[in-house]
Design a protein with these regions (language model features):
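Class I SAM-dependent methyltransferase Rossmann-like catalytic core
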Residues: 83-97
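Conserved class I S-adenosyl-L-methionine
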Residues: 112-120
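N-terminal auxiliary segments of SAM/dcSAM-dependent transferases
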Residues: 1-75
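Charged, low-complexity
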Residues: 77-79
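Catalytic micro-motifs at enzyme active sites that drive phosphoryl/nucleotidyl and oxygen chemistry
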Residues: 104-105, 116, 124
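Conserved SAM-binding loop of SAM-dependent methyltransferases across substrates and taxa
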Residues: 121-130
């Protein structure tokens, strides 16, 4: 299993000297990442919701696995999670399952419509499907 660790680096709008940083390069990289995600083929997969959100792909060749791995690397830093994409474990700075597991016994979401606003990664959205 490949384990990807979170990074402590963050994007800043000023440099260490206090000068403004041109975010156009960052915005262009972001557009490239979105395009790569949109161009991914639809994969047949199984979803399993445990402490991590697990996605098991069916009939995925090594080239596609490598593409997913490279795309996952480009999405760093990972703040919330964890996620398991086939054999790629994406660790995170904040272990979202700890908080969710504390709240879950007190939540009755059956038949409810829930807006997962501001989580920045969808972890809780996936967990609320359960």
């Amino acid at each position: 299993m490949t384990r990807l660790a979170p990074t402590k680096k963050s994007v800043r709008t000023t440099s260490s000297t206090g000068n403004s940083v041109d975010l156009s390069k960052f915005n262009e990289q972001q557009k490239q990442i979105y395009n790569r995600i949109e161009n991914l083929a639809n994969f047949d997969c199984e979803l399993e919701l445990k402490d991590s959100v697990n996605v098991k792909f069916k009939n995925l060749d090594q080239a596609k696995k490598d593409e997913i791995y490279d795309l996952a690397l480009s999405l760093k830093p990972w703040r919330k999670g964890p996620f398991l994409l086939d054999d790629i474990y994406i660790d995170s700075e904040w272990q979202s399952f700890i908080k969710f597991n504390i709240l879950a016994p007190h939540l009755n979401l059956a038949g409810k419509c829930v807006a997962d606003v501001g989580c920045n990664n969808g972890y809780y959205m996936f967990k609320m499907l359960k």
